Amino acid sequence: MHGRKDDAQKQPVKNQLGLNPQSHLPELQLFQAEGKIYKYDHMEKSVNSSSLVSPPQRISSTVKTHISHTYECNFVDSLFTQKEKANIGTEHYKCSERGKAFHQGLHFTIHQIIHTKETQFKCDICGKIFNKKSNLASHQRIHTGEKPYKCNECGKVFHNMSHLAQHRRIHTGEKPYKCNECGKVFNQISHLAQHQRIHTGEKPYKCNECGKVFHQISHLAQHRTIHTGEKPYECNKCGKVFSRNSYLVQHLIIHTGEKPYRCNVCGKVFHHISHLAQHQRIHTGEKPYKCNECGKVFSHKSSLVNHWRIHTGEKPYKCNECGKVFSHKSSLVNHWRIHTGEKPYKCNECGKVFSRNSYLAQHLIIHAGEKPYKCDECDKAFSQNSHLVQHHRIHTGEKPYKCDECGKVFSQNSYLAYHWRIHTGEKAYKCNECGKVFGLNSSLAHHRKIHTGEKPFKCNECGKAFSMRSSLTNHHAIHTGEKHFKCNECGKLFRDNSYLVRHQRFHAGKKSNTCN
């Protein structure tokens, strides 16, 4: 008895259903094709009728191909035993052609295909095949460029009604697809599927070039452009090219000035919905991106990616001019301006231009008079933290920069660079006005003010202006009475470094006379 049962289970589905392999070939092919998806009731059916959202749409093209159109309704009858018919109970699916009713969605779908005798519709352009004429018509709009479906909110047009429906959720805020793991909601089911890979850790898309793996195929496609250097997306306005279409779309808004996305909390507007989403985390305090290595959390995914390179040491961005590599794209962009000489950031106060926005921000503090960085030793304040760090070495005596040629040490890297030119004799910076050459760019910049008469550093006390910041600092000591410069020999204090230098010559002269 058990042996027969085992034998029966080893039989293909077609034999268990009582069909003859020779006389019912189309039917057998049908169940063979669907064997991986649907199992018969007596074989622990894996997909029940309630999971079929729309049975006629769930049947595969393989099934449609293999069902013989010559079989009448009694074909489906032959698939069920009398016992099964008795157990059907409520009949959920009814055929509109003949009124025949079915309990299971799959059986109803099979029956419908026999009636409709569906034809395959082929695209003349690319050869793609569709089971419905409407699907073919929708597909052909890709080739023709026709976009008949328009959004009433923003005027954006689409090939398909389904794409318009998805787009509308941006305006309505509807997010019907929820992650069972973390409760996050999405406006598209594909976005939910992609998101769920974060929880599962699944990265099915691998780069053949470097072996890096990705959650999404779009991320792999974007990554590949790093290896190829391809930038297929060009701006029609200014000719700038981009590796990703999303970058081009973002760039185009610069020309239009459009900011359609508004924060409901503070009213701030943004060019892109992604920027709005990132901004809103300021209000919520949400930091959903966590580093698996050290546990640090971030509000933006890009911040996590940048942080992760601290652990990996990865530097994927290479300068084509000099070969220098960088961990961040922004660092490469900033570096590239050394070669191009581009300075896109301009001060509205004095017109001075800078290669980096951070340099402009530092410069603006000069005009504001703000000095937020204060020395704990002498209470001297600075507009930049780097200046405070450099100043603090006066108190500590630290000189971390050493000349490899003569062993002399310096408190600042710029001093070492200046000193190094004594050994090389290099004077790379030339004044276009008088031809004088300088070892440092800063020295040339100071010198140029002789020709221009520029005095950007103004005293808030008396209004006197200076061409150099150090001159203003020294002058300011007249008003405050401060004396920061101390003689190590006798402890005498001076408000100007030049006075200290002169004074130290007095000690040097005394020592010389003593020796004599």
From Swiss-Prot:
GO molecular function terms noted in the UniProt entry: DNA-binding transcription factor activity, RNA polymerase II-specific; RNA polymerase II cis-regulatory region sequence-specific DNA binding; zinc ion binding
InterPro entries with a match to the protein in the record: Znf_C2H2_sf, Znf_C2H2_type
Keywords linked to the UniProt accession: DNA-binding, Metal-binding, Nucleus, Repeat, Transcription, Transcription regulation, Zinc, Zinc-finger
SMART domains hit by this protein: ZnF_C2H2
Main location: nucleus
GO terms classed as biological process: regulation of transcription by RNA polymerase II
Region (Disordered): 1-20
Zinc finger (C2H2-type): 93-115, 121-143, 149-171, 177-199, 205-227, 233-255, 261-283, 289-311, 317-339, 345-367, 373-395, 401-423, 429-451, 457-479, 485-507
One GO cellular component term noted in the UniProt record for this chain: nucleus
Pfam families: zf-C2H2
Subcellular location: Nucleus
Function: May be involved in transcriptional regulation.
Protein family per UniProt: Belongs to the krueppel C2H2-type zinc-finger protein family.
PANTHER family: NOVEL KRAB BOX AND ZINC FINGER, C2H2 TYPE DOMAIN CONTAINING PROTEIN-RELATED (PTHR24399:SF71), ZINC FINGER AND BTB DOMAIN-CONTAINING (PTHR24399)
The name this protein goes by in its record: Zinc finger protein 83
Biological source species: Homo sapiens
